Every structure is written in C-alpha cells, then in structure tokens.
Amino acid sequence: MEQLPVNVVGWLESLKKQVNDGRKYGVVSHPDSRSLSRSGDVVVKLETAQWNQTAPYNQMLPIIKGQRAYTGCTITAGAIVMRYHKWPNQGTGTIPGYTTSALNLERPAIEWGHTYEWAKMPLVYKTNGYTEEEGKQVARLMLDLGTMIKADYDSGGTGASAYYLATELPVYMGYDKSALYRDRYEYSDAEWQELMKNEIHQRRPVIYSGFNENSGHAFVLDGYTTDSFFSVNWGWGGYCNGYFLLNALVPSGSGAGGNNDHYNFYHSAVTGLMPDQGGDYIESIRL
C-alpha cells in the first residue's frame, strides 16, 4: 500500500469504507434497496431548488439533432447553489465565447445587459405551472453558467468540470475568492465528513461530484444527520433526493444525464461558495 499513489490509496480506502458501511447498515444489492433509510436526527437541512436539466432550464441552449441540449449536471448544481444564495443581482466583466470540444459549436460571449431576478426563479418548476418570465429567468442563468465554465454540449449529455465553478464564480459572479475545489483523496474519511458538515452548518450548500465505472455526476449536499447521512439534491427535479452516506451514493433511479448507477468513486467538492466576503484565494494543496 505504501508504494501506491496517494489517490489510489484513498480510492481503495473509500471502497473499503463503503463495504463496511454496507455491512453495518444492512445494504443489499436489490434495486429496491439501493438507497439507505436515513439514520440519525437531522442537524441541518438547507432548502435548495429542485431543478433539472431539461425545459425550462435549457430553453436558451443549442439544438442538437432536433432537441435542446441538456444544461449539464455541473451547471444545474451550480445554479441551485446560486439560487440558494440569491446572488448576484448581475454578473461582472465579459464572459468570453468558446468552441465546444465534442461538436465544435461556437458559443458567443456573454455581455451583462441583464440582471437575475431570483424571486422569479421558483424552487420548484411544475409542468405548466410557471410563467414565461420564470422560465426565461432560470434559462438565462443556465446559459450564463454554461458559457462561464465552457460546457461541452452534445446530444447524449453535457460535460463540464466543477473545478471551474470554484475559479470562475468569484471572477464573474461576485462569489468569495476562498471558494475551493477539493479532492477527497487528500483527506481522511473523518476529515472529509467534518469539512462537508462545516460547510452545510455555515449555510453553504456543497457542489459534490462522484463517478462510477462509466461516467460522473455533480449534485448538491444540503443537509446532514447525527449519523453522518447527507441530504443529496441530485439535480433531477427532486427525483431520488434523500439522505445517503458519502460512501454509498447510490440513488434509487436516474434522471437527465445519469446512468442508473452509483457515484462512489473519485469524489470531489466545491467548498466556500458564498457571496463575496473579502476572502482571498486558497492554494488547493495540503501538506
């Protein structure tokens, strides 16, 4: 074990913990039992938007093979956190345009001739239960975020890295510079859980990412219990939301961009997301 790279060691330890937790809580591999019942009392539960990746969220995105592109899970997770803070009123600077990787789509730059009217972005968009303006407001936010982190729109889904939410939100959206992208393998399980709990306790929902053998997914942690179960907002319009152990992130189904699998590998998180408090950039290196 000592000769293995630290990230591999961290991954193996995470798998070991996942197996042990499964035995402890009686997890079985039946599809009806893929998510655990919540254990412990709720310590903090933040109210976050139950948003998704399709209409109305994607109505300003490019049409690919006759259909609007998905917003992308990373963009949806970022938008959910921004809606929680209701910040900013307007972006700053000019978000540069770019060319997507998969399809070479030319995406135009974003100029700030618009503001965000958070009161017109409801926490839940029910089918035929929102106004045209409410649809436009959330779609505008998704478009801006996608351009900001250079979303790679494709017919099968939209790719983007949560790393760029940490670096670009302070630049264009007035978020604190202390926002940081963190890899789980750099921390012990206890340290990582305490870090996530502290963020939520400080009223900062966490953008969290996990992978399986085929793909990854970004979502939001917005609560936790005394037994270290975390409330997960999967970014699927409320579908599959619930409490999960961080070593057993196995939703009972899948929404837009998902693949009906677990997300237990290669965890990372964006912490410190909050309106500008005068903080400074933090080096993402732990000694």
Predicted regions and their residues:
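Active-site-adjacent substructure of cysteine-protease-like catalytic cores
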Residues: V171-N233
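Cys-His-centered catalytic/binding microenvironment captured across papain-like cysteine peptidases
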Residues: M1-A49, H201, N214-S215, T225-L287
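Beta-propeller domains
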Residues: A151-T167, V171-R182
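Active-site-adjacent structural segments surrounding the nucleophilic cysteine of cysteine proteases
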Residues: M1-T158, T225
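Generic structural hydrophobic/aromatic packing signal, biased to beta-strands
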Residues: C73, L145, L169, Y208, ...
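Stable alpha-helical elements in mature extracytoplasmic
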Residues: A69, T74-V81, S161, L165-L169, ...
